[in-house]
């Protein structure tokens, strides 16, 4: 930061960024739905390695979420919900762990900023923008994402890897992964798994969006096919769960004819996808089974978790590479959370996840809640990576905001059965002024 402010060019860039941010806030304050557009554009079309260093690495997505929070906070009229308290408890424990020196700065930043900002943005946007508008913006955005992923599969060209602006994340996330001799679609997400999970989460929003039925069916088909060409089992299974969840839990949002069409498309799509994916996984040989075995082996790290703070088995070498015992990476969000922050924060979030499953079955359902529940099982096999982290916590915030809205809309109205109450008189209006 000192280097940026110490040079004329750096100071000019900083002033330009602040000016753009101020305009962004003013525009969103006037048209709140543009906050959703800005966040979704940065989420879906900007690779995770693009950003600038201002003491910390700031991505356009983080900036868009922060700008939306600043612009829309006033008037959001949020009330504390149970999950608000749970997340504050978790992030507070992380902050205490950092102050105590048992949580690293990198991990504390990832939780407090990476999760907290996305959640708060979703929470506030959900209070200021109608669910229908949010769902329609998400549907259009992921229609574009799905189209780009399908084009990437057929052309074998990812246009985003040519964007080299930003920090050191390019080397980590820009490489295209292959499975069975076939490149996996990644889009701007830096990972096929992240793209697959995000596509699955978009399904309920497309389902309840204000798009016409034909356009809605087309986008759902594109999203499902795009999930297939990620060749990510997590993405494909989560997408199926999301579609089934929509059919069962959000059926009232569409016509019976549309439900029948989607059910038929689901059967036809499965008939097409199974041979395609089986050929790829067969060609991959032991790669897929080894990947599954590796995730099973991660359970051996559970006894290494501390009650609060990072595990003692975590080491970081001179190159900044972190290892947990003999494992170089942890592809399981619950296990990584327990290793980085401790068992207590993990138990709180596991309890919140179970509450989400109960809520989606017993309370008024919404698209964001169905989206979150659809991917929770997959979190056991994927960590919070790239924009998938923001997508997940943004949806959690939207789900809680919808619950907040519903609690007010459906609150019982208690009628007054006593004698009529005369309103207080206003001087000079309801009573004559005193004569002197």
Task: Show which residues each predicted segment covers.
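N-terminal hydrophobic segments of proteins, predominantly signal-anchor/transmembrane helices
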Residues: 33-51, 60-116, 373-378, 431, ...
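Transmembrane alpha-helices of multi-pass inner-membrane enzymes
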Residues: 67, 371-376, 385-436
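A membrane-periplasm/extracellular boundary helix in multi-pass inner-membrane enzymes
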Residues: 147-157, 247-287, 303-305, 435
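Hydrophobic transmembrane alpha-helices and their immediate junctions
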Residues: 244, 248, 259, 340-376
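Long extracytoplasmic/lumenal interhelical loops at the membrane interface
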Residues: 278-341, 356
């Amino acid at each position: 930061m000192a280097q940026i402010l110490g040079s004329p060019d750096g100071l000019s860039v900083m002033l330009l960024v602040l000016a753009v941010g101020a305009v962004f806030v003013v525009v969103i304050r006037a048209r709140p739905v543009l906050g959703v557009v800005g966040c979704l554009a940065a989420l879906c079309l900007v690779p995770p390695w693009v950003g600038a260093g201002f003491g910390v690495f700031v991505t356009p997505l983080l900036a868009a979420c922060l700008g939306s929070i600043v612009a829309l906070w006033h008037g959001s009229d949020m009330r504390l919900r149970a999950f608000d308290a749970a997340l504050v408890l978790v992030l507070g424990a992380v902050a205490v762990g950092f102050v105590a020196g048992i949580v690293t700065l990198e991990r504390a930043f990832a939780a407090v900023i990476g999760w907290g900002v996305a959640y708060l943005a979703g929470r506030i946007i959900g209070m200021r923008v109608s669910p229908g508008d949010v769902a329609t913006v998400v549907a259009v955005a992921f229609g574009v994402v799905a189209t780009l992923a399908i084009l990437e599969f057929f052309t074998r060209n990812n246009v985003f890897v040519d964007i080299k602006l930003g920090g050191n994340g390019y080397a980590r996330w820009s490489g295209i992964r292959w499975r069975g001799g076939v490149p996996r679609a990644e889009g701007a997400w830096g990972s096929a798994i992240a793209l697959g999970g995000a596509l699955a989460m978009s399904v309920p929003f497309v389902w309840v969006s204000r798009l016409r039925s034909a356009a809605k069916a087309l986008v759902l088909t594109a999203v499902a096919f795009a999930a297939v060409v990620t060749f990510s089992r997590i993405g494909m299974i989560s997408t199926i769960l999301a579609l089934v969840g929509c059919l069962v839990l959000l059926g009232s949002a569409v016509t019976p004819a549309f439900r029948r069409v989607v059910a038929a498309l689901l059967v036809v799509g499965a008939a097409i996808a199974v041979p395609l994916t089986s050929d790829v996984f067969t060609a991959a040989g032991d790669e897929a089974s080894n990947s599954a075995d590796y995730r099973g082996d991660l359970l051996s790290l559970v006894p290494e978790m501390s009650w609060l703070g990072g595990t003692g088995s975590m080491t970081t070498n001179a190159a900044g590479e972190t290892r947990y015992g003999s494992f170089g990476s942890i592809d399981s969000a619950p296990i990584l959370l327990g290793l980085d922050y401790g068992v207590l924060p993990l138990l709180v979030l596991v309890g919140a996840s179970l509450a989400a499953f109960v809520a989606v079955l017993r309370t008024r359902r919404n698209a964001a809640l169905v989206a979150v529940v659809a991917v929770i099982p997959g979190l056991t096999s994927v960590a919070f990576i790239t924009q998938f982290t923001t997508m997940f916590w943004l949806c959690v915030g939207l789900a809680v905001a919808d619950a907040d809205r519903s609690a007010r809309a459906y609150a019982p109205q208690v009628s007054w059965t006593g004698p009529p109450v005369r309103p207080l008189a206003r001087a000079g209006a309801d009573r004559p002024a005193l004569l002197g």
